[in-house]
Amino acid sequence: MKVLGIRFCKVAKAEDAEKLAAMLGENGLGLTPNDMGPGDGFNGAVFPVDETAKDGQGSWVELWPAGENMPEMTMLQIVVDDADAWAERAKNNGVDIKGPDDAHGERIYYLDGPGGLPIAMLSKAK
C-alpha cells in the first residue's frame, strides 16, 4: 500500500479562486497550470507539481469557482495505489469512511477529518 500523491482542492467565490490561481501562476509563484481549454471567465485551474500528475496519480493544486452544485470548501485528497485496501484498513481501525464512488476514472472514498476537514482517498478505478 502506497501513497502516490497529495492534492489540495479549494472551491471558493469565483473572484477569490481566480486571484488565488493568479498568485500561484506564472506571474506569481511561477507554477504552470494545465490548459483548461477555452471558456468564458474563470473556469478553474489545476497546477500539477510533479511529472506523475499528468497521469492523474501525482500531486497538484486545484482551484474551482463555487457554484450551484459545487459549494465553497477546502478538501485534502490522498491519491493511493488501491483505495479499496486503504478504505478497508481505515474501517478496521474504526474510521468512519463513506463510499466508494466511481467518478472520472477514479475509485473514491470520503471521510471527515477532525475539525470537519473533508478528505477523499482515491485511486484509479479498476
PLM feature spans:
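Vicinal oxygen chelate
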Residues: 13-18, 75-118
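N-terminal beta-strand motif that seeds the catalytic metal site of vicinal oxygen chelate
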Residues: 1-22, 27, 73-76, 125-126
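Conserved short beta-strand elements that form part of the metal-binding/catalytic scaffold
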Residues: 29-71, 118-125
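Conserved acetyl-CoA-binding loop of GNAT-fold acetyltransferases
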Residues: 25-33, 93-96
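A short, local hydrophobic-aromatic micro-motif
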Residues: 4-7, 32, 98
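Proline- and acidic/polar-enriched loop/turn elements at helix boundaries
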Residues: 8, 36-38, 102-103
